[in-house]
Amino acid sequence: MLLSDVDIQAALEDKLIQIDPFDPQMLQPASLDIRLSRYFRLFNNHTYAYIDPAEPQEALTRLVEVAENQAFVLHPGEFILGSTCETVSLSNDLAARLEGKSSLGRLGLLTHSTAGFIDPGFSGQITLELGNVATLPIKLWPGMKIGQLCFFQLSSPAKNAYGSPVCASRYQGQRGPTASLSHQHFYRARFTEIGL
């Protein structure tokens, strides 16, 4: 079930959803707007010949901090990591979905490339996968509305929520734009093992 503004407000009051800092003006009819921090991770395109998700590549990205009164210019075809200002914490019976803002989508800004789902039990700032598919550069201002979170009630609380020892929760407690940790617990099925 998708939560309405009434349900989101009640979940905030009951601390089933925790948003820090919380601004009541960010509450929408069925979502909560989130804002862009001033930290970005840029890809070092000349450091590696390719990206290998199975291997650690610590120098693949570098952290950049933009002054509060300055914009970060995202060029056409460029892909960077950003972060929300807000730290988001979810109870074991709520999940969330990150969606872009319609007005920014109409300018060619992608807020996330594929990873818009936030598991129950997650706590941390949300890393944004920002891409410019327009033909002109886009200015990204720290503090601007960058997306919205929709919240969903689970049919029952998760037995092993994000952050539990059973899950490979690589990003629990993340602060700022967090580079990929895909090499940790990397899984690749062997076709002979799965009967293909």
From Swiss-Prot:
Its EC number is 3.5.4.30. It comes from the Bacteria. Gene3D superfamilies: 2.70.40.10. Bifunctional enzyme that catalyzes both the deamination of dCTP to dUTP and the hydrolysis of dUTP to dUMP without releasing the toxic dUTP intermediate. GO terms for biological process: dUMP biosynthetic process; dUTP biosynthetic process; nucleobase-containing small molecule interconversion. Belongs to the dCTP deaminase family. The record marks 116-117 as: Important for bifunctional activity. It catalyses: dCTP + 2 H2O = dUMP + NH4(+) + diphosphate. Homotrimer. It is an enzyme of class 3 (hydrolase). Keywords: Hydrolase, Nucleotide metabolism, Nucleotide-binding. InterPro entries: dCTP_deaminase, dUTPase-like_sf, dUTPase_trimeric. The active site is at residue 129. DCTP binds at residues 101-106, 119, 127-129, 148, 162, 174. This is dCTP deaminase, dUMP-forming. One of its GO terms (molecular function) is nucleotide binding. Pfam families: DCD. Pathway: Pyrimidine metabolism; dUMP biosynthesis; dUMP from dCTP: step 1/1.
